[in-house]
Regions:
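Catalytic cores of alpha/beta
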Residues: 1-29, 110-146, 163
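A cross-family glycoside hydrolase active-site/sugar-binding cleft signature
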Residues: 8-12, 31-33, 55-59, 94-96, ...
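A diffuse structural propensity rather than consistent per-protein peaks
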Residues: 15, 38, 77, 108, ...
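Conserved anion-binding
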Residues: 20, 27-101
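C-terminal helical cap(s) of enzyme catalytic domains, especially alpha/beta-barrels
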Residues: 41-49, 136-164
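Short, hinge-like loop/turn segments at secondary-structure boundaries
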Residues: 48-52, 72-75, 111-113, 142-143, ...
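Active-site environment of divalent metal-dependent phosphoester hydrolases
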Residues: 101, 131-134, 155
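Leloir-type glycosyltransferase catalytic cores
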Residues: 103-105
Length: 164
């Protein structure tokens, strides 16, 4: 199946087989978080096989990574994980600031700037806190490759036609 638009899928991915099934259904890229910690070997194999289609999804709270739908807090910080992921071939990273997600309080610009400065070759996707078009413009300046607009779109703060 081929969609007339790009489809990135995320949530609940726990195995290499699930990723392969999603790709066979026409999904362009997958966001993977928990698998990074539950089965690093499988995640690294996916990176090797699909380097442009795998997005590492790291959710952070108080500078610590959470996973399993934010149910488990790790002792890891982003900088504990990213160098190894990059050495395995990671090209795309989505970072969600848990404290900002769904709050419409503005994105964590300092966090994204720091990440882009340390990891300039990663395509960075910002998630959490976006309120309006001004926030998207600010994130373009980081620069972020993409932005998850979630609640801002659902609440009507963003008009997709206006963004295109």
């Amino acid at each position: 199946m081929k969609f007339p638009f790009r489809v990135d899928y995320g949530g609940g991915i726990r195995s290499k087989k699930q990723v392969q099934q999603l790709f066979s259904l026409g999904v362009d890229a997958v966001n993977i978080g928990t698998l990074i910690f539950s089965d690093r070997t499988a995640f690294n194999e996916l990176l090797a096989e699909y380097p442009t289609r795998i997005i590492a999804s790291l959710d952070v709270k108080d500078n610590r990574i959470a996973y399993r739908a934010w149910q488990e807090n790790s002792t890891f910080q982003i900088d504990d994980v990213l160098p190894d992921l990059q050495s395995q071939g990671l090209l795309k990273l989505c970072v969600t600031d848990i404290e900002k997600d769904g709050m419409l309080s503005g994105p964590s610009l300092a966090l994204y700037r720091a990440l882009k400065q340390k990891y300039p070759n990663l395509d960075l996707i910002a998630s959490g806190g976006v309120r309006d078009k001004k926030d998207i413009i600010a994130l373009e300046g980081v620069p972020c490759e993409a932005v998850i607009i979630g609640k801002a779109w659902l609440n009507g703060n963003l008009n997709l036609r206006e963004l295109c």
